[in-house]
Amino acid sequence: MNTNDFDFELPEELIAQTPLKQRDASKLLVIDPVTREMTDTHFDHIIDQLNPRDALVMNNTRVLPARLYGEKTDTHGHVEFLLLKNTQGDQWEVLAKPAKRLKVGAKVSFGYGRLTATVTEELDHGGRIVEFSYDGIFLEVLESLGEMPLPPYIHEKLEDRDRYQTVYAKENGSAAAPTAGLHFTPELLQKIEAKGVKLVYLTLHVGLGTFRPVSVDNIDEHEMHSEFYTLSQEAADTLNSVKTAGGRIVAVGTTSIRTLETIGNKYDGQLQADSGWTNIFIKPGYQFTVVDAFSTNFHLPKSTLVMLVSAFAGREFVLEAYKHAVQERYRFFSFGDAMFVTRPSEK
């Protein structure tokens, strides 16, 4: 298939620049690939789409304030870092600007010396391995000096950094939020649990590659970035029990889907405690082994995320749903509205 097969018209004014005042006040488009019905509702009614025997699976990763602004210690030239992943100890892979000035041995100071980075290795495309030195606890220093790494299509300043975290964010490590989870409130989760739905958490640390456009014409030639995931034995046991009892596995967001399907593919559709790196690329033709339904935001044209939704619900129907969302003035991308998709019965 061609990348252009997943293109659609999107007016720029529909790209949400700020979160809504109330998380669950966002709109929700419910689509059924079997009946091809579309229903416009609001996110706090997602509970109506969930059955008492279901499990709702959420990604509890926490976004690091991973954007740092500092200066070279010798020339005082301005430097920007975006932390990508912790390689070991105090060593991190970062995206540096301007990278050409940062050779091995270069030192960068942040917060008037509260945090210092030494370049230990040069990578391609502006990447660097750096070793940080600091007093105290690294994450506390980062919280005080770093800024949230908002997506490139958001130009407004984020007034409250907690709005780019889910209410259940726990495990530090992401360069971007698992945005499908931003709509949930503690009260809504309590109501869902009270209905008899199991709340299950996994972790996938979202990498910067989530914003990387597909640069090839043939989607089969696209290579996904790798992201680290973890599923506990307790979570795996709960999900297997739900499946056995006839309940559905309902994933919140594409990161939860990719984690569950990665593990399901390893263990013949069953789930076990597992952790590792995944670069699974879910596109039309993929056969789902674990996930029965999911919620997700509205994604970029020609993105791998639109391809994933199309693999689940069919490309033509997904593009119809996106056209409907544009006509109904749904808000798109990270701070935008959501979609709920049920599993086609024939799969």
From Swiss-Prot:
Pathway: tRNA modification; tRNA-queuosine biosynthesis. One of its GO terms (molecular function) is S-adenosylmethionine:tRNA ribosyltransferase-isomerase activity. Pfam families: Queuosine_synth. Its main location: cytoplasm. One of its GO terms (cellular component) is cytoplasm. It is an enzyme of class 2 (transferase). It catalyses: 7-aminomethyl-7-carbaguanosine(34) in tRNA + S-adenosyl-L-methionine = epoxyqueuosine(34) in tRNA + adenine + L-methionine + 2 H(+). Its EC number is 2.4.99.17. InterPro entries: QueA, QueA_dom1, QueA_dom2, QueA_sf. The keyword S-adenosyl-L-methionine applies. It is found in: Cytoplasm. Keywords: Cytoplasm, Queuosine biosynthesis, S-adenosyl-L-methionine, Transferase. One of its GO terms (biological process) is queuosine biosynthetic process. Monomer. Belongs to the QueA family. This is S-adenosylmethionine:tRNA ribosyltransferase-isomerase.
